[in-house]
């Protein structure tokens, strides 16, 4: 067990938030805040550790934050794409997982299929971190919770409205919020709802934590008295062929703009995982306005992931 976490999370995968519990999640958030406050104290805790990073999707925040994070903790990173590995030429994931387990201490993978990450974790003898799949984006959710915690000094009872596509970011945000007792409101058009299985699991988590989940097509209803308003792009990577239809289906009704946010609390904060499509899901006025905390949120990817790495590796 790492000296920096109360729970025995050493060696644990982060495939989705479903493998973790409320106490473990809260410990990571608090450790992330401590690391952000006093980074020098933790600058050598992963000395000698190597993080392998595999990318099948383009990345800015995930790559830079993970690579900088492991370096700031005293470790090293090896960055790869599937095209550079034998897995890109047909080597079974099983073989890749076993071989890489002989060389490095953990793998972070950013890819399309969640099943690929699960298969990698099944065969690997080292921790696997999901840097994003089409179904989950747990590391983003850690940064989201950290940002909320920094502003409110609590998580339970916070009113969070998510407006937009029921995508991977929404799935992980929903699970994270339900786990820690957040009042979550989701607003999205028909055909873009969250995965039913994930919603059911989130509802069970909310019952245990005292959280609430409300799903509606009415974005104005969702943001009523909200502490935080969150949105994401309407067209994610790999969905470019659907862009015209998606723009029409979402439209101004689901755009975070001055009219919509007027229903939130006067001191609300705006969240976005980035990259953003200004004047689509959010107006420039809002994303660049005084309520926006998107750069703090993006910066917290670094600190939340450093805490995650410390929790799953044998920190010194």
Curated annotation (Swiss-Prot):
InterPro entries, per database record: Asp/Orn_carbamoyltranf_P-bd, Asp/Orn_carbamoylTrfase, Asp/Orn_carbamoylTrfase_sf, Asp_carbamoyltransf_Asp/Orn-bd, Orn/put_carbamltrans, OTCase_ArgI
Pathway(s) annotated for this protein in UniProt: Amino-acid biosynthesis; L-arginine biosynthesis; L-arginine from L-ornithine and carbamoyl phosphate: step 1/3
Binding of L-ornithine, residues: 168, 232, 236-237
Catalytic activity: carbamoyl phosphate + L-ornithine = L-citrulline + phosphate + H(+)
Keyword Transferase: yes
Localisation: Cytoplasm
Positions bound to carbamoyl phosphate: 59-62, 86, 110, 137-140, 273-274, 301
Keywords per UniProt: Amino-acid biosynthesis, Arginine biosynthesis, Cytoplasm, Transferase
Pfam family, one: OTCace
Gene Ontology CC, one term: cytoplasm
GO MF annotation terms: amino acid binding; ornithine carbamoyltransferase activity
EC number(s) from the headed UniProt entry: 2.1.3.3
Superkingdom in the source lineage: Bacteria
GO biological process, one term: L-arginine biosynthetic process
Top-level enzyme category: transferase
Cysteine pairs bridged by disulfides in the record: none
Summary of the function given for this chain in its UniProt record: Reversibly catalyzes the transfer of the carbamoyl group from carbamoyl phosphate (CP) to the N(epsilon) atom of ornithine (ORN) to produce L-citrulline.
Record HAMAP family: OTCase
Family per similarity comment: Belongs to the aspartate/ornithine carbamoyltransferase superfamily. OTCase family.
UniProt-recorded name of the protein: Ornithine carbamoyltransferase
Species of origin: Listeria monocytogenes serovar 1/2a (strain ATCC BAA-679 / EGD-e)
